[in-house]
Curated annotation (Swiss-Prot):
Recorded GO MF terms: ATP binding; metal ion binding; methionine-tRNA ligase activity; tRNA binding
HAMAP family: Met_tRNA_synth_type1
Cellular compartments annotated: Cytoplasm
PROSITE patterns: AA_TRNA_LIGASE_I (PS00178), TRBD (PS50886)
UniProt KW NAD keyword: no
Protein name, per record: Methionine--tRNA ligase
Positions of short motif 'KMSKS' region: 345-349
Sequence motif 'HIGH' region, residues: 17-27
Length: 713
C-alpha cells in the first residue's frame, strides 16, 4: 500500500464486468486498457494509486444466463469470475485488487449504504404497476423485458436501457414489450419499490458537472441530453430472485416485506468499488485505510467506463454519494465509445468478437503477445467516437511499428554497442547539432506524453511515444554510424551513446502500454532501479517518469544484451492473420449471421401488396445534399440540408455509422417530400432520403441525375 500520508491519493476504478461471459476486445478498449495505461503512468510518477475492479455478480444478466442454461446463478459466477480475473492478469492488467460482488463484505457494504440513504430520507417509496409475466409468474425487471425504445425506435431495447441510443429506460416505457423468458405479452401488476429522486437532485448534479469543463465532450454531451429531458426518479429495488437483498429492518420500517426484493444491480455495482477497496485495505493489514481513498477530500476519484455506463457513473452513483454525504465525488469519468470489428458492430450473440482468452491462447508463442494486443488496441481506442479493429490493422501495427520502428531501432543500437564498443556505453564528446537536437527532443517527450495521459488522450500518448522511436530511427539513419565507425569513430560513438539514452527513455515511456517488452529492454541495456508500474512497493531511490528525458546510462555502463541480441518483436505472418479472420467468419457462419459476407444470405421478405392509389400518395423528388453534419448525442444520425430546387429541406438520415459527412455532400438523392415533419434530438426532420439496404446491412444511396425538384415516378 502506498503512503497514506501523501498530499493527494488517486483512486482509479474500471467498470465491473458482468460475470456471465468472457472478456472481449470491446471491453478492453472501452474501459480496461485505458485505465491500466493511466494507472501505470501514475505509478511511474510515484503517485499514491489504488486501482480497483471486480466481477459484477448480481442482477438480471446473471439470472438470465442461469435460466437459459438451466444452472444456478452461483454456478454461473463461479465459472466466469476466475476466468475473467485470470485472463486480465495474463493480459497485464495491474489491478491493486480484483474483487467480486457476491462477497459478504459487498453485501454488508451495500445494505449499509442503502440503510443510510433510507434513514436520511434519500429515497421515495412508490407503489405502482410494473410489468409481470403471467406465464413465468414473476415481475419483469430490466433485461427480462424487451421492446421498442420510445426515444429512437430501436426494436430490441431492454427494460433498463436502450443500447442503440444509450437512453436510460424503465420497463413500462417500452413500446410493444415482450418477456424474454416466455415471449409472453406482459400484464401490469402492483408492487412497491424504493426510488432514487434524480429529478430533485438535478440542480446539484448540473452544478457539479458544470465544475468540470475538462471532461470529454462525448461524456458531457450525453449527460446534457438527459438534463435537457429532465431527470426522473429511478427505482433502485427489484422483484427478482438474485441480488443483494433489501435489508429486513429497512422494509419493516415502512411496513413492508423484504422477501423477494433485491437492490437494483446499478445501485449495488458501483458500491462494489467501495467494498473491493475495503477488502484490499484489509488484505494490506490496514482495514480502515479504505476511508483515506473514499472519504478524504484529498482523493482524486476517476472512473473508466464504456459509454453505455455513463448514466450510471455520472448521474446515479454521484446522486447516491451526494445523498449519503460521507464520500468524495468522481473527479473524472473518461468514458470511451464502442469498438467495432472488421467494419461491423461487435456482437457476441452473432459470434462476431475477438475473445481475450482465445487471443492469449492463439498467440501464446509470440514474443510479448499481450503487449501486441495492448499496443494495437491503444492506437485504436474509441476515445471520442466509435473506432474499428481489424486483424490486418493489428498486423500492420505489430510489423510496421513495433517491429520495424521500435524493435529495429533498439536492435541496431544494441548491435552496434556490442560490435564496436565492447558492450558498453561509449562517451559523448563534442556532440554534433544532430546529437543535441535528438537529446533535446528526448527531454521534451515525457512531459508531452504525460500531458496526454493526464487529459485521457491515450492514443496521443502512445503515438507520441512511438514518435520518439521514429525520430531515433531517423537520427540513426542520418548520422550513418556504419560509415562513421571507420571515418569518424567519435561521431559513431556519439550516435550510439545518444541512441542508448533514447532506448533507456523508451524503456520507461513505453512501460504503460508495453510492460513486458519495456522490462526486457531495460534488462538488455542494464537499466536498474526503475520505479515499478505494478502494485508492488517502489524501490528506494527509484528512477521514474520524471527522469525519462534525461540521460540515464553513463559512459562505460555495461550493456548486457549479448553479442547477438534477439529482436524485441517478431513479425506476424499473413497465415496467422488469415487464420484469425477465418475463425471469425466460420463462427459467424455457424450462426448464419456472418456480417462480412453477402453471399448465400436471405433477402428481406417482400412487404404486403399496396394499391396503386397508395403509391401515388408518395411525393418523391430529386434533390442534392448541400450540407451534412453529425447530430449531437445521436451516433446513427446525420443532419442533411437537401436542395429540392424550390426550397431547402432539413432531413435527419440514419447513416452516420456507415457514411461520413463528406461522403454524403453532393449526392443527388431521392427524397420523400410529403412526409410529416418529425422532431428528433432537437431537430425537425422534414422528409426522408431513400436508401437501399444490402443483405449485409450496408446502405447505398438511391441516386438520380434529374433536376432538383423533379418528380420521381
Amino acid at each position: 500500500m502506498a503512503d497514506p500520508t501523501s498530499s493527494e491519493r488517486l483512486l482509479v476504478t474500471a467498470a465491473l464486468p458482468y460475470a456471465n461471459g468472457p472478456i472481449h476486445i470491446g471491453h478492453l478498449a472501452g474501459a480496461y486498457l485505458p485505465a491500466d495505461l493511466f494507472v501505470r503512468y501514475q505509478r511511474l510518477k510515484g503517485e499514491d494509486v489504488a486501482f480497483i475492479c471486480g466481477s459484477d455478480e448480481m442482477g438480471v444478466a446473471i439470472l438470465m444466463r442461469a435460466i437459459r442454461e438451466d444452472r444456478t446463478p452461483e454456478d454461473i459466477i463461479d465459472t466466469y469470475h476466475p476466468q475473467i480475473r485470470d485472463n486480465f492478469e495474463r493480459f497485464g492488467m495491474s489491478f491493486d485488487y480484483y474483487g467480486r460482488t457476491s462477497s459478504e463484505t459487498h453485501t454488508e457494504t451495500t445494505q449499509d449504504f442503502f440503510r443510510v440513504l433510507d434513514e436520511n430520507g434519500g429515497f421515495d417509496l412508490k407503489t405502482d404497476e410494473q410489468l409481470y409475466d403471467p406465464e413465468a409468474e414473476m415481475f419483469l425487471a430490466d433485461r427480462f423485458v424487451i421492446g421498442t425504445c420510445p426515444v429512437c425506435g430501436f426494436e430490441e431495447a431492454y427494460g433498463d436501457q436502450c443500447e442503440q441510443c444509450g437512453s436510460s429506460l424503465s420497463p413500462t416505457e417500452l413500446e410493444n414489450p415482450q418477456s424474454t423468458l416466455t415471449d409472453a405479452t406482459p400484464e401490469f401488476k402492483e408492487t412497491t419499490h424504493w426510488y432514487l429522486p434524480l429529478g430533485e437532485l438535478q440542480p446539484q448534479l448540473e452544478e457539479w458537472i458544470g465544475s468540470h469543463p475538462e471532461w470529454k465532450n462525448n461524456v458531457v454531451g450525453q449527460i446534457q441530453s438527459w438534463f435537457d429531458e429532465g431527470l426522473k426518479g429511478r427505482a433502485i429495488t427489484r422483484d427478482v430472485l438474485w441480488g443483494v437483498p433489501v435489508p429486513d429492518d429497512v422494509a419493516e420500517r415502512h411496513g413492508l416485506e423484504a422477501e423477494g426484493k433485491v437492490i437494483y444491480v446499478w445501485f449495488d455495482a458501483p458500491i462494489g468499488y467501495i467494498s473491493a477497496t475495503k477488502e484490499w485495505a484489509a488484505e494490506q493489514g490496514e482495514p480502515d485505510a479504505w476511508t483515506d481513498y473514499w472519504q478524504d477530500e484529498d482523493t482524486r476519484l476517476v472512473h473508466f467506463i464504456g459509454k453505455d455506463n455513463i448514466v450510471f457513473h455520472c448521474l446515479m452513483f454521484p446522486s447516491m454519494l451526494m445523498e449519503h454525504g460521507d464520500y468524495v465525488l468522481p473527479d473524472n469519468v473518461p468514458a470511451n465509445e464502442f469498438l467495432n470489428l472488421e467494419g461491423e458492430k461487435l456482437s457476441t450473440s452473432r459470434g462476431w468478437a475477438v475473445w481475450l482468452h482465445e487471443y492469449l491462447d492463439d498467440f501464446a508463442d509470440e514474443r510479448h503477445a499481450p503487449d501486441l494486443l495492448r499496443y494495437a488496441l491503444a492506437t485504436t481506442l474509441p476515445e471520442t467516437k466509435d473506432a474499428d479493429f481489424s486483424w490486418e490493422g493489428f498486423q500492420q501495427r505489430v510489423n510496421g511499428e513495433l517491429a520495424n520502428v521500435f524493435g529495429n531501432f533498439v536492435h541496431r543500437t544494441l548491435t552496434f554497442a556490442q560490435r564496436y564498443f565492447d558492450g558498453t556505453v561509449p562517451p559523448l564528446e563534442d556532440p554534433s547539432e544532430a546529437d543535441r537536437v535528438m537529446l533535446d527532443r528526448m527531454a521534451e517527450v515525457p512531459d508531452t506524453v504525460g500531458a496526454a495521459y493526464e487529459e485521457h488522450r491515450t492514443r496521443d500518448a502512445v503515438f507520441e511515444t512511438m514518435a520518439l522511436a521514429r525520430r531515433g530511427n531517423k537520427y540513426f539513419n542520418d548520422t550513418e554510424p556504419w560509415h562513421t565507425h571507420e571515418s569518424d569513430p567519435q561521431a559513431c560513438a556519439n550516435t550510439i551513446h545518444v541512441s542508448l539514452q533514447v532506448c533507456a527513455a523508451l524503456s520507461i515511456l513505453f512501460e504503460p502500454v508495453l510492460p513486458s517488452a519495456a522490462a526486457t529492454l531495460r534488462e538488455r541495456i542494464g537499466l536498474e532501479n526503475v520505479r515499478t508500474s505494478t502494485p508492488d512497493d517502489d524501490p528506494a531511490g527509484a528512477v521514474g517518469w520524471e527522469d525519462a528525458g534525461a540521460p540515464l546510462l553513463p559512459a562505460g555502463h555495461p550493456i548486457p544484451s549479448g553479442p547477438d541480441p534477439e529482436p524485441l518483436f517478431q513479425k506476424i505472418d499473413d497465415d496467422t492473420i488469415e487464420a484469425q479472420i477465418e475463425k471469425l467468419r466460420d463462427r459467424a457462419a455457424e450462426r448464419d449471421t456472418d456480417p462480412s459476407s453477402t453471399t448465400d444470405m436471405d433477402y428481406e421478405a417482400l412487404s404486403d401488396n399496396i394499391s396503386f392509389d397508395d403509391f401515388t400518395q408518395l411525393d418523391l423528388r430529386a434533390g442534392t445534399v448541400t450540407t451534412a453534419e453529425p447530430v449531437p448525442d445521436a451516433d446513427k444520425l446525420l443532419r442533411l440540408e437537401v436542395d429540392l430546387g424550390f426550397e431547402e429541406r432539413q432531413i435527419l438520415a440514419g447513416v452516420a455509422e456507415q457514411m461520413a459527412p463528406d461522403d454524403v455532400v453532393g449526392l443527388e438523392v431521392v427524397v420523400v417530400a410529403n412526409m410529416a415533419p418529425k422532431e428528433m434530438f432537437g431537430f425537425e426532420s422534414q422528409g426522408m432520403v431513400l436508401m437501399a439496404e444490402e443483405p449485409d446491412g450496408t446502405f447505398v444511396p438511391v441516386t438520380t441525375e434529374a433536376e432538383d425538384g423533379s418528380v420521381v415516378r
